[in-house]
């Protein structure tokens, strides 16, 4: 095969790997965001069914927002080379978080400065740069015309908070994956919109539950399924949720969504 064919095959293989790594990390990030919303006392959330659903839906939306911004920044739709934008960017935040975590510094759960910064970024994307008083010469972002960033359509995300430790861990899971030489930044520009779409679709399959008793995820017929830990027997346990902790499960009782790659462009309704 020609050199170009080989490059194409390699980049496709890389995108597939990024996609599958990301699916596992997205799963973990969603659980951490949910835990973060519950852990913040000022959010006044109980573990009622209603609050669990609300946290599930909004952790999902927050994930969509973060994935959207990672993708848009990687494609320079949001220009991280612009000094004004860079100060507010997710790129700057992910680098700051990575540096802290690599130095063994744990961000504090009681502070929510990362969240405040993100909320400004969400507002910038929703309202556009001119609403912030920037001239077109300084930099320009048109107002985003969808529901995803609209504060009125997402009152939970406009009023609740999440502590730095939870947000840092979730953002780092989305920003970096474990490579052969340690952690490396995920190249979102290698994903096409369908890859991102299949990850979005996978997220939609998740339901947040609170474990009534200790739960274990075990491999069964090539899939990971959740069951009470006492029923796990000698099977290899891949994940656990202690009683009272949150865990994510699909409608089929599986631990992880199977979001197939190369699904049609249904994602367009989000973006």
Regions found by a protein language model. Give the residues of each.
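Preference for the N-terminal adenyl/adenosyl cofactor-binding alpha/beta module
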Residues: 1-270
């Amino acid at each position: 095969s020609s050199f170009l064919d080989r490059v194409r095959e390699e980049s496709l293989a890389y995108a597939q790997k990024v996609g599958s790594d990301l699916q596992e990390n997205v799963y973990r990030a969603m659980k951490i965001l949910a835990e973060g919303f519950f852990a913040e006392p000022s959010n006044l959330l109980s573990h009622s069914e209603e609050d669990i659903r609300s946290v599930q839906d909004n952790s999902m939306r927050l994930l969509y927002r973060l994935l959207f911004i990672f993708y848009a920044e990687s494609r320079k739709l949001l220009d991280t080379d612009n000094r004004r934008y860079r100060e507010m960017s997710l790129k700057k935040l992910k680098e700051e978080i990575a540096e802290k975590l690599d130095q063994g510094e744990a961000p504090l759960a009681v502070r929510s400065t990362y969240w405040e910064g993100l909320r400004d970024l969400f507002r910038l994307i929703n309202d556009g740069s001119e609403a912030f008083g920037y001239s077109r010469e300084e930099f320009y972002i048109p107002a985003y015309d969808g529901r995803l960033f609209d504060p009125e359509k997402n009152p939970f995300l406009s009023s609740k908070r999440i502590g730095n430790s939870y947000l840092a861990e979730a953002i780092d899971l989305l920003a970096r994956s474990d490579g052969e030489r340690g952690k490396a930044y995920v190249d979102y520009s290698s994903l096409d919109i369908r890859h991102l779409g299949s990850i979005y679709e996978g997220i939609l399959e998740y339901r947040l539950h609170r474990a009534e008793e200790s739960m274990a995820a075990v491999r069964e017929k090539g899939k990971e399924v959740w069951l009470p830990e006492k029923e796990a027997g000698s099977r290899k346990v891949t994940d656990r949720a202690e009683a009272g902790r949150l865990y994510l499960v699909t409608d089929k009782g599986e631990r992880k969504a199977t979001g197939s790659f190369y699904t049609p462009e249904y994602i367009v309704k989000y973006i």
